[in-house]
Design a protein with these regions (language model features):
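Short amphipathic alpha-helical segments
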Residues: 4, 96, 100-103, 164, ...
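An exposure/low-complexity boundary signal
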Residues: 143, 179-180
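GHKL/Histidine-kinase-like ATPase module
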Residues: 13-154
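Short, small-residue-biased leader/transition segments that mark boundaries at the very start
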Residues: 2-6, 179
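Flexible helix-coil linker/hinge segments at domain or subdomain boundaries
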Residues: 162-178
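Short, low-complexity, polybasic intrinsically disordered segments
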Residues: 149-166
Length: 180
């Protein structure tokens, strides 16, 4: 088990002890390991970005409950061109994304585009700026808790609940507006 296990845990402060009875230490006790993540999503974003040059020193953290959906997001920007979004529903990795990722992207794009328009940053551009442009260098971890998740596909790795789009959109928009 790698040290990545606990960092991936979305529940900050949880401590996990593992004992492997198949492998013994020199004193005859089972090999054991302890995993602890104090920082939860923020720590995970820092871990994902540890080899990249940060544009923002500390990740932005969002925690809200909207439409009875608890939403947690940690995000940061780095100097790469790639977007790296990791998402979870009820602690299940939804590596194909889904409605919670759609809500996040929609809110981020709308808020940043509105800010750029109002500040005049886009006036001299001869091209239309898209959501992909705002997500270059973005690292984000999204975690939602959904009472009755509806997963799409056989692998159940994509959230299909349409109401979650609005919940995540609203939570992310509200906090992003504070930065504009």
């Amino acid at each position: 088990v790698g040290s990545e296990m606990c960092i991936r845990d979305r529940n900050a402060g949880i401590r996990i002890f593992l004992k492997d009875f198949r492998e013994l230490e020199d004193d005859g006790t089972p090999k054991s390991d302890e995993f602890f993540s104090e920082g939860g999503l923020i720590e995970f974003v820092k871990y994902l970005d540890e080899t990249r040059e940060k544009i923002i020193e500390e990740p932005i953290y969002i925690e809200a409950v909207d439409q009875e959906v608890p939403v947690q997001v940690a995000m940061n920007y780095n100097s790469s061109y790639a977007e790296n979004v990791v998402s979870y529903v009820n602690t299940i990795n939804t590596y194909e994304g889904g409605s919670h990722v759609t809500g996040f992207r929609r809110a981020l794009t709308r808020t940043l585009k509105s800010y750029a328009d109002k500040s005049g940053m886009l006036e001299k551009l001869k091209i239309e700026v898209s959501g992909d442009d705002f997500r270059e260098g973005l690292t984000a971890v999204i975690s939602v808790k959904v009472a009755e998740p509806q997963f799409e596909g056989q692998t159940k790795t994509k959230l299909g609940n349409s109401d979650v789009v609005g919940a995540v959109d609203s939570a992310v928009s509200e906090v992003c507006l504070l930065y504009t």
